[in-house]
Regions:
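Short, solvent-exposed loop/turn segments at secondary-structure boundaries
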Residues: 84-89, 121, 225-227
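Serine-dependent amide/ester hydrolase catalytic core
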Residues: 78, 114-118, 138-245
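General small-molecule cofactor/ligand-binding pocket signal
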Residues: 106-111, 251
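Short low-complexity, flexible loop/linker segments enriched in glycine and/or proline
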Residues: 121-127, 227-229, 266-268
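Alpha-helix boundary/capping residues
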Residues: 40-44, 125, 137-141, 149, ...
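N-terminal beta1-alpha1 cap of cysteine-dependent amidohydrolase-like domains
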Residues: 80, 90-93, 97, 107, ...
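Structural helix-boundary/capping segments
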Residues: 1-83, 91-103, 172-199, 207, ...
């Protein structure tokens, strides 16, 4: 699965959840297929105000060229710095590091200090934006309408039936974070973490072509298995949130199977508008993992 550079793929026609975070990217059976689809759907769209006018380089150009002398940074905070990360996941991530090194890349451990605070920051920023964006779905102007005896009852009925439990939970979190007396204490601090994270990434990308981490601290869980445990689902976002907060591209590549028979993913992160190198490294990782 691919998360492109923020603004690299048009979001026109998309339901907005968190406007500064929402992105569209492909799922595919191979890195090459993902790159091809990305080339097709990417590019400037005047109907999307966040769309980047800069033309991206073809994402398939570097496929098959190897990764000799590319510099890869392994984010230590997302390896051993996560509470509860699976030993199996760490082992597979270390195997991925070895595979890239054997393929000619220069692989080194790096530090991304702000990554330790990203999970908390994300679950303040995203729900806050969702609370604002989804307030328009009142049954009058957009979307589903459920009748009531008066306007207030119609609004309540519409939002009660139109939003699932997780959406309601995030709206409540966001409304609380934006409420008087809590904005500076929570939302304002989350934005500071976001700025600090962007600075951390900028410093790393001065010296490294891409970064590497696990995709998740555990193997994939089955669909619906954790629905009643939202905190577990939130915590499993810890590795993928950093690139999303700053709008940088990232790709998750399957790299082995855990003892429970479920897949383990390795994530490659890249500087904005530099997906071609990201795909180049991901292809090497894909070949090593098959």
């Amino acid at each position: 699965g691919v998360k492109p550079t923020y603004g690299g793929v048009s979001r026109y026609g998309l339901l907005a959840f968190a406007s500064s975070l929402d992105q569209v990217g492909p799922f595919a059976n191979s890195v090459k297929d993902a790159a091809i689809v990305h080339e097709v759907i990417g590019g400037f769209d005047p109907l999307d105000s966040t769309s980047i006018k800069e033309a991206p380089s073809p994402f398939t150009d570097l496929l098959g060229q190897g990764i000799n002398n590319l510099k890869v940074g392994v984010i230590k905070e997302l390896m051993g710095g996560i509470d509860g990360i699976s030993d199996e996941v760490i082992a597979r991530a270390n195997e991925a590091v070895t595979a890239l090194s054997n393929a000619g890349a220069q692989v080194e451990e790096v530090s991304l200090p702000a990554a330790l605070y990203c999970l908390s920051a994300y679950y303040l920023i995203a729900p806050a934006e969702a609370s604002s964006n989804l307030s328009r779905y009142d049954g009058v102007r957009y979307g589903l309408r459920v009748d009531g005896n008066n306007l207030n009852e119609m609004n309540i009925n519409t939002r009660t039936e139109g939003f699932g439990d997780e959406v309601k939970r995030r709206i409540m979190l966001g409304t609380y974070a934006l409420s008087a007396g809590y904005y500076d204490a929570y939302y304002g601090k989350a934005l500071k973490v976001r700025r600090l994270l962007a600075e951390n990434f900028a410093d790393l990308y001065k010296d490294y072509d891409v970064l590497l981490s696990p995709t998740s601290p555990c193997t994939a869980f089955k669909i619906g298995e954790k629905v009643s445990d939202p905190m577990t689902m939130y915590v499993n976002d810890v590795c993928t949130i950093p690139s999303n907060l700053v709008g940088h591209p990232a790709i998750s590549v399957p790299f082995g199977i855990g003892s429970d028979g479920m897949p383990i993913g390795i994530q490659i992160l890249a500087p904005p508008m530099n997906e071609s190198v990201m795909y180049q490294v991901a292809e090497t990782l894909e070949q090593a993992g098959t």
